């Protein structure tokens, strides 16, 4: 339903398949593209192959946590150029200070609401004209 000529590209990272699918469907319904990763290792693999505009990232996952993905991005800044990292987690409160130190400015509670996603998209479009 977006009137934007160039869709944003999202990477949706969550170890719960239903949540990943739900967030991806929300993104696609708004006229954008969504790739999925089931954990941090898959996220890093995707980030090395593609450029994304926004990453919706869970914190607590097997193999590699969301926090570790953010650390990897800080160590590999060429992979995160223009990428907005948005933490989506029910448990982010106690990690907020660490996330802020790593440069994460947006932390949203699960479940992600449609209006929150629309707001993220509008903010990104405002900052990054396409």
Whereabouts are the PLM-identified features?
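Acidic, metal-coordinating helix/loop segments flanking the phosphotransfer/catalytic sites
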Residues: 36-54
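His-Asp phosphorelay/catalytic-motif detector in bacterial-type signaling
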Residues: 51-53, 78-84
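Active-site residues of response regulator receiver
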Residues: 58
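Hydrophobic/aromatic residues positioned on beta-strands within the core alpha/beta folds
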Residues: 86-88
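C-terminal output helix
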Residues: 112-121
């Amino acid at each position: 339903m977006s009137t934007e000529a160039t869709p944003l590209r999202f990477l949706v990272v969550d170890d719960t398949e239903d949540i990943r699918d739900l967030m991806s469907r929300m993104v696609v319904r708004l006229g954008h593209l969504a790739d999925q990763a089931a954990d941090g290792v898959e996220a890093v693999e995707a980030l090395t192959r593609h450029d994304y505009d926004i990453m919706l990232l869970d914190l607590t996952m097997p193999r590699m946590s969301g926090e570790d993905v953010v650390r990897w991005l800080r160590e590999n800044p060429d992979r995160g150029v223009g990428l907005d990292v948005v933490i989506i987690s029910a448990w982010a409160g106690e990690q907020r200070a660490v996330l802020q130190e790593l440069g994460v400015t947006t932390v949203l509670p699960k479940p992600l609401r449609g209006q929150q996603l629309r707001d993220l998209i509008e903010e990104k479009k405002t900052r990054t004209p396409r």
